[in-house]
C-alpha cells in the first residue's frame, strides 16, 4: 500500500496544519492507526458519494463501521476506546475529504478525542487534535 495520504481539501490543509495530520505512522494521529488509515482510504474510494452536506454518520456508513450513536455510561472493556478511534478517524476523514463537518459530527469527534485522551493520557498529539477541533468554525460547517 502507498504511504501517501489522500489529498486533503484546502480548508483542511489550512486549519489542520500540524505534522500529525500527514503522519501515516503515528498511532495517535488521525490516519496513523490501522483503523484511521483504512477508514480514510475506504471512504476516499467512494468520495463521490460524499455531498457538500455529508455527515459523520455518512462517513461511518460508507466505511461500514458499526459504532453506537451514543457513548453510553458503562463501556464494556475497551469498547469506548475502539468506538472513539473510529469516530475520531471518521470525523477527520470527513474534514480531510470535504473541508466541512456537521455540527453533531463535530461534537462526536470532539467527544471521541476526549475519550482517547482519557485512555492514553494527555499526549501532545491528542491535545493538538482537540485544540484544532475546538477552533474549527462552528457557525458554518464549511470553510472556503
Question: What residues fall within each predicted segment?
Answer:
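Amphipathic alpha-helical elements of HEAT/ARM-like alpha-solenoid repeat scaffolds that form extended
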Residues: 24, 81-97, 130-134
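Catalytic toxin/effector domains delivered as secreted proteins or via bacterial secretion systems
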Residues: 39-47, 65, 96, 107
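Short loop/turn hinge sites at secondary-structure boundaries
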Residues: 46-53, 62, 98, 144
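Acidic, Ser/Thr- and Gly/Pro-rich intrinsically disordered linkers and low-complexity segments
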Residues: 57-81
